[in-house]
Amino acid sequence: MSSPAVLTDREIGLARLAAHGLVRPEDVAPEDVVRALGAVQAQDLPGALVSVALRRAGGSDGLRQSFDDGRIVRTWPMRGTLHLVPAEDLRAWLAVLGPRTVASTAARRRVLGIDERLDAARETALAALRRGPQPRERLHAVWEEAGLLGEPGRAYHLMLALHLDATLCLGPLTADGRDQLVVPVADWVPAAGEEAAVPGGTAGGTPPVVARWVRRYLRGHGPASVADASRWAALPRSAVRAALKGADGVVAVHDRAGRELWCAPEVLEGPAPGGRRAAGVFLLPPFDEYVLGYGDRSHVLAPAHAARIVPGGNGVFKPTLVAGGRIVGTWGRVRRAGGAELVLDPFEELSATRRKAAERAFARLPAL
């Protein structure tokens, strides 16, 4: 048996770009992109839509329809953070991961009196939704009218709790595409996938949904470590390792420090991981999975520059400039009379060739 390949940081970055589907976007549906990644972090919805569009040949074509048809939904499956998830996996994800978020927010729920108000909040929300999908603000208003609010943060935690117990989810896009309307899960999402949440389907009792997620995560993000996968889903490392025992379609590699990483074997094919296109320039939106999908970003981002992608450590990640598989700067846009203009903030001197490549990437950004 041959030893696992040893990859440089550059090779890891290039392989990750290929795994993410950013190098050669395929002709797939929007929900296929979300499914391949496992989930897409989406507290910034417009950025998440760009993340999906960049990973498919059709760009933004049909993207709205995938939400309006109920094929992609948004909820809080893990880490108390909004994500896009395939609708068919919604119940299973929440069955496995939801209790961890409930436990982590228990103290705040007690202070706000969430549990004693939850049944009334559910009843009033579902009554309002009989008239069709509603903006979150409308549900906040009916809760206010019912005397369920009054404390800052109570509306958010009631909404979170009703998403975590699979009563509600965020479904169709609003007219401006910057938010979603709330819908009842029972009406919006087919009752499928629940069997995947039942423990005991794989060796060691790992729930099938966890085994399936670990495989998707590593194929869609790898090379990545067990620690990366564990942190991203807030699952114990032991659960990730158990899922790996039966995972097909992933192989082990090592970085130069000898740390074990896992990835899809096809991202390692050819003369260089990811191929020549992976060495090009990419403009990624804020909170993109290429950045947020890892606990350890040091393979693609110099630690000295880490603070520059999230200034002040406030949790608000900036759009990133990627070149040669490395995060080499951030970017933004300004409005001019003639249209939008790209503004680059490289961490170090950027060659004229890469600047021109960034301009071309800017011109190709999906229109939403």
Walk through the language-model features, giving the residues of each.
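Long, low-complexity intrinsically disordered regions
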Residues: 1-291, 296-299, 303-368
